[in-house]
Amino acid sequence: MAFFSSSSSSFPVVFARMEEASSSTGSTGGAMAGIPVIPSTSAALLANTNLEPERIAVLQTQLQEYRQKQMDLIGHFQRAQQELSVQHMHNLYTALQQQQQLQSLQERSGINPMLISQTSEDATSGPAAPLSLANSLTNLLSSSNGNLSNLSVPQTPTKEHHPTLPPQQPSAPTSSRKSDLPRTNSTTISQLTKDRLKNMIANRSKGESNSQSNLMSNVNGHDNSRRLKNSNSQMNVSSPHFEPYRLPTSLANAHNLQQASEFQLRKVNSEPNLKMKIRAKLLSKGNSPVQHVQQTNNSQFSFTHPQLKRSDSETSNMPIDMLPSGSHSNIPHLMLPSPSLPNLAAATGAFQNLNLPIGQDLTAFMAVANLSPFLSLPSLLNKKLELGGMTDEGDRNGFSSSASNSSLASNASLGSHQYQSLLKQQIRDLVLRRKSLVREDPEGEGMAESYNGLFSHAKLQQLTALAMESGFNPKLEPTFSTGLGYDPLMARHECVCSNNSNHVENGERIQRIWSKLTEEGHVAKCERITAKKASLEQLQMVHSQTYTTFFAVSPTACLKIDANALPLKRFLQLPCGGIGIDSDTYFNDASTQIAARLAAGTLIELSSQVAEGRLKNGFACIRPPGHHAEAEQALGFCFFNNVAVTAKVLQAKYPVQCAKIAIIDWDVHHGNGTQLSFDDDPNVLYMSLHRHDNGNFFPGTGSVTEIGKGAGKGFSVNIPFSGGVMKDAEYLAAWRTVVEPVLASFCPDFILVSAGFDACHGHVNALGGYEITPEMFGYMTKCLLSYANGKVVLALEGGYNLDSISAAAEQCVQALIGESDDAGRLCTDSLENLPNQSALETLQKVIAIHKGFWPALHGQEAAINTTEMQWRNVKLQVQMQQQQQLQQQLQQ
């Protein structure tokens, strides 16, 4: 009755008389107990008071509203009672069914059924008859006013495959307890708990007393099936089987439940598991780092797995020529390190000892010497240019003498007009980017000092003069290209089961994307950088030293470290037979370290070249992903946080060029690791568009209230969508009302994108479920090029539908190249549809929280509930008005 509060002095009198009338009428019984009832004589009561007619009318209206609310509450209460009764009846039905199945199984196996009769002494005097759920529900709801169709079924954010109940035969209720159970909530719950406890005690006593009979039945070949059924009966809660993980065919017919993982909250289930992992991590302190899960009690998989052995992972640090030369088929898990650029001095040595026959093709000659990228023109060879700074004087003399062979002279007769455009491009690369031609791995940075310049100053002057003769002006503004980062070695990261169909995150993801880019001709238009492994020092900018050693070198390198300091206490045996750090993320000591270091190192190299101005932008086709990895926690297929490590390296290496870095994360999952890495850094802006479902979607973080801490408050901007399927219209609304205004206010010097494509259409609900088009990712990429002088680098994160992610990546690279207007061209539906109500509520919350940190968000509420086409028209009209006003001011 809060609406009766007023400044009028007559209101307390009315309230007191209403309370007296309410107490005189009493309270209703049953469902109406405890709920006050408005007296029916309210009109007469109001007439006795000295109130004005208008106030009386207001009070009558309020009384009618109160009665309506009262009836609504009563209706909700009755429906809630019905739902609770149905739920309790279903629990009772499940418990009785399990008990009957256990009894029938033991009778068929020859076990004394008296062991179970102790647990069911309260239920029936003999074998329990099968219980029909439909009949029980009918009896339960027969006395209520509601019906079954009014019951609401709670929806879950993931698609679950519930085991179907076996068909039951109808039977007459032979026990009075069956109808008495649902009388009250407390009786039902306590009795059900008692039955479960008795069932557990009986199972334990049965295992102790019948160990001898179990041994005999194992000899007869019946022990495996009995243990499987017993494990099913003991498990009260089992993880449902989800589509991305298939059960082995040998076990698919035996049961339809999946093994309960150590952490029941998995990425493929789209459930938050960070708190559960931290709790389990604390409980398992002091355990051995290599410990196998016993399969006898808590596993439904009966296959065996070989013992975890130390592999020859040290080969990743050996030179290529020291590695065994056997075939890859004999060594399936041997991973070769990614080669850097060819050693130019070694190339000239091979060049010096080469006996070039007369008439050999010049292209093949240069290919042998590994010099074709910068010495493929007869005009350059005729000049007899010396390669200063590359070899000693003897090598240069040998090269000069070899350049005067008749084979080169015959090739020099070719017309120079055929090479004019190629000459310009190569001279441009030599003069403006000569320092990038010799790159060494971070482990050999000490040797890089001898390669500071590929050409001496005198040779550069000769090259410049030659360029001027060919019509190329080196003072003109160069046209930079888009960089691509890719190495096929990253695809070798796989589970030891060697069956990619068991894992949604596999090497085929980057292979399909690279094939798509090659087919569309984008690889030929871009510059592919050399993949490099990240150094341990670079990885330790985000991750701890022990964590880096564990996952970048080998777990065996941490045997002497205190067990409490290890990032992982034990490995898990996955349902596929492989080894994992959790039920989602597999680990292979022969391939994981190399792939993880290559992924981080490739992104660092690509971003460094963009920051230095040698590339205009870039796309890193890398795996494994990284935005879930925290400082000491591998999670969600991620080992090292590639984007976070790269941002730290850019801050340290280029403090002026990359003073402010913006990280845009459009993966459908929140990048918990990236946000934590810069939670208190005001120089790094982290913005994420992701599915949240009020914390019920993996990893459960990224709510609208997570805004950073300390000096970084306001620099973590989360757009967590909940409820409903998001499409282009919802992402466009978020982009124009939140992302672009904040980016414009932040004025970043460099932009990194966690480009996960699992929000693209084609993904199952458990892995995303949104319906974003590939063109939308191209549109967002094109918009980002308007900031930070176009210094934008995309890093592949998630995305598991191969067709969707390859199409989305192709749109992004096409937008980065900038030669086609088709990149990011949205369809009519995307431009003319309004965002749904769930997205509107989310964006309103984000603007309300962050407009105190970003004044540009003020007034953006009006732009939420509009279509993209309407917003563009309004924006165009405003721009035209501003231009007219500017022209008028200039004329005056």
UniProtKB/Swiss-Prot annotation:
The lineage of its organism: Eukaryota, Metazoa, Ecdysozoa, Nematoda, Chromadorea. It comes from the Eukaryota. This is Histone deacetylase 4. It is found in: Nucleus. Residues 145-225 are annotated as: Disordered. Its EC number is 3.5.1.98. Belongs to the histone deacetylase family. HD type 2 subfamily. Keywords: Chromatin regulator, Hydrolase, Nucleus, Repressor, Transcription, Transcription regulation. Residues 481-822 are annotated as: Histone deacetylase. It catalyses: N(6)-acetyl-L-lysyl-[histone] + H2O = L-lysyl-[histone] + acetate. The keyword Manganese does not apply. One of its GO terms (biological process) is epigenetic regulation of gene expression. It comes from Caenorhabditis briggsae. The gene is hda-4.
